[in-house]
Regions:
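Conserved GNAT acetyl-CoA-binding A-motif
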Residues: 104-114
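A short helix-loop-beta-strand connector motif used in the catalytic cores of GNAT acetyltransferases and
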Residues: 45-56
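A short beta-loop-alpha structural element at the N-terminal edge
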Residues: 5-20
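Conserved acetyl-CoA pyrophosphate-binding loop and the N-cap/start of the following alpha-helix
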Residues: 87, 91-99
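Conserved beta-strand in the GNAT
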Residues: 56, 62-70, 77, 82
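Conserved GNAT-fold acetyl-CoA-binding loop/helix
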Residues: 20-44
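Conserved active-site alpha-helix within GNAT-family acetyltransferase domains
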Residues: 94, 115-134
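A conserved beta-turn-beta hairpin within the catalytic core of GNAT-like acetyltransferases
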Residues: 71-79, 88, 107, 132
Length: 149
């Protein structure tokens, strides 16, 4: 099963698939990103034409997920990691992450996980990640005239 898991670097030919998977990631983690698939495709294109690289995880001929890494940051930054819904909780995430770290030759990598994504937090902690910061946001609610309530 996992011996067939392969990783490859994405190209522009993968953008449509990456956009669909990214949309599923946004939905699954209940992110507030409202971009549609076409907007996500264009954003992903911008990523992979800069210091980011996207990686597809394939088991045989089937795509089972992807990762997006910012290679300009030290340590490297894992911006997105997604395993397809129908193969979750079968060990693919663990194997894909370990193979990815080997593929990119990384000993240290950072990531952020949304505080309400308890499944994600549990996965990352089980993989050995440690809490390092608390990322916070203030959304200042203003009336239409620009004055605070």
């Amino acid at each position: 099963m996992f011996q067939d898991l392969k990783i490859r670097v994405c190209t522009d030919d993968d953008l449509d698939m990456l956009a669909v998977l990214n949309k599923q990631l946004i939905e699954d983690e209940m992110h507030d990103n409202k971009m549609n698939v076409e907007q996500l495709r264009e954003r992903m294109k911008g990523f992979i034409h800069t210091d980011y690289k996207a990686y597809i995880f394939e088991d045989g001929s089937r795509t089972i997920g992807y990762a997006l890494i910012d290679h300009s940051r030290k340590p490297l930054y894992l911006r997105q990691f997604f395993i397809c819904r129908d193969v979750r909780r079968k060990g693919y995430g663990r194997v894909a992450l370990n193979k990815l770290l080997e593929f990119i030759d990384a000993d240290v990598i950072d990531l952020e996980v949304l505080s309400w994504n308890t499944g994600g937090i549990g996965f990352w902690r089980a993989m050995g990640f440690k809490d390092r910061s608390i990322y916070m946001r203030l959304e200042n609610k203003r009336e239409q005239d620009g004055k605070a309530p």
